[in-house]
Amino acid sequence: LILINYIQELVNNYTTKKWKIKAEYSTNDNNKRVITIQEQTGQKEVFYGDIMPMFNYYMFDIYGLSIQECKNISLMLGNLIGHNIVREVINNGKKEKWQLMFIQWANPQPIEYLDIRRVGYNATYKCVVNKIWEE
């Protein structure tokens, strides 16, 4: 949710067109511009035992009205590589600080999608989403 909220904020500031960022996508949705963010498989490193991995992989599927607008959003997201963002949020009445580190952006490519209202573009991010402080 931290990553989805951050990406929604970025996209809102990047374009005047309305995009919806969410965890799942359905062709029954009437949304014309959608980015889904889902955890993806990949090599995950941990220090010991059952602690959280140092980083995760997230697949971004970008569905828009043209390949060009999907590509432009993809390029904007690709520019996050190397950035380290600390976000302060309130969760269940408590302040929390979360760290987002964007390490790698792989496989950006157009995807075939049989829904005639939208075209797609997808890529996978390797990034850290980690709670670093809680009140």
Where is each model-derived feature located?
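Small/polar-rich, solvent-exposed N-terminal microdomains that initiate assembly or binding
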Residues: L1-D50, N84-Q99, E135
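Short N-terminal helix-initiation segments at or just after the protein's N-terminus
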Residues: L1-E9, D61-S74, K131-E135
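Short, low-complexity, polar/charged sequence segments that are solvent-exposed and flexible
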Residues: Q40-Q43, M54-M59, N79-H83
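Short, solvent-exposed beta-strand/turn "edge" segments of beta-rich domains on protein surfaces
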Residues: F47-P53, Y113-I116
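Oligomerization/assembly interface segments of phage tail-like spikes and tubes
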Residues: M52-C70, V119-N130
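Mid-chain, well-packed structural core segment of small domains
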Residues: S66-I90
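Acidic-leaning, charged glycine-interspersed low-complexity segments
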Residues: G82-V128
